[in-house]
Amino acid sequence: MLACVCLNPSFDRTVSLRSFTVGDVNRVLSARQDVGGKGINVAITARRLGIASCVLGCAGKNGIDAVRRKLDGEQVTHVFLPVDGDVRTNMKIVPQDGTGVTELNEPGAPVNAANQRAFSDLLAEKTVAGQYVVLTGSLPPECPPEYYRDLMLSLPERLFVLDVSGAALMAGLAARPFLVKPNRSELQAAMNRPLPTMADVHQAALELLEMGAQNVLVSLGGEGALWVSERGAMFAPAIPVRVQSTVGAGDAMVGGVMAGLEKTGDVRHALAYGAAAGCASVMTEGTQLIRPDDFAALLPQVQIQDV
């Protein structure tokens, strides 16, 4: 079973407009709300692709029942530690004129030191040696950037996948995660330099290996995805599809990769699964997750290239 950690779940509200003007009244064309959080998105994606998944996390007492109902409906098992506060609401403003998505993200309910210790115990209890465990998403208030690193160091027999950015990513590399998955922007921030070419991205991924990562998957949006390890590198070009929304595409890619690893144990197949899932994700509106039929149609079109 795939385990996904979600310490900061959310209600993701997506509004669509013809255009968005700061400082003016903007008329909404449509709106929808989904239960979100990167760990939740990864788990649901993997489950829709046939992989048994569970979510382990913390959630504000106000709203936790709605999160649980969503996961029950997706047949994803879950254990949440209730904490004081509300499940946060994130707003995604999507103009139809192509000017880009604006996101307004609340910080979430604080997870204090006692909660952190309790969750560490929960993760040890609910996972086993050799199991894939995905650590992803923003850390809630009061959680230090080293928290993911400390979880990994406390359970070295697990196969951790780290999909975070900034200080949490840099700290986490010391625990030698099985896989890290930055996008280009996150990788540029980690390297503190621009990475305009594929060669630049490849070199930066190699540097992450030197810092501790065992495998690096860089998601490159409409270009595709690059997998780098000590054994070599592979590139999966993006499949041309009609893009409805790019929100959650990175989570879908991670969910697809994990489904591929769980089913085959082969990183080449896992990259193909991730590429197909990421492309399937952008075919859905707002924060909706992938449709299995879209994934099944796209998977045979993925062409993995050795780099």
What are the residue ranges of the model-derived segments?
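General beta-strand structural signal in soluble alpha/beta enzymes
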Residues: C4-L7, G57, F80, V134-L135, ...
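Short acidic, glycine-rich surface-loop motifs adjacent to enzyme active sites
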Residues: G130-P140
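Conserved N-terminal subdomain of the carbohydrate kinase-like
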Residues: D24, R48-Q131, A297-V307
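Short, conserved phosphate/pyrophosphate- and ester-handling motifs at nucleotide-, phospho-/glycolipid
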Residues: A46, N183, G250
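Conserved phosphate-binding/catalytic region of the ribokinase-like
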Residues: A171, M198-V307
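Glycine-rich phosphate/adenosyl-contacting loop at the front of the ribokinase-like
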Residues: M1-L56, I64-A66
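Short beta-strand scaffold segments in enzyme catalytic cores
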Residues: I44, M91-I93, G224-V228
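Conserved phosphate/ATP/ADP-binding segment of small-molecule kinases
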Residues: P145-R231
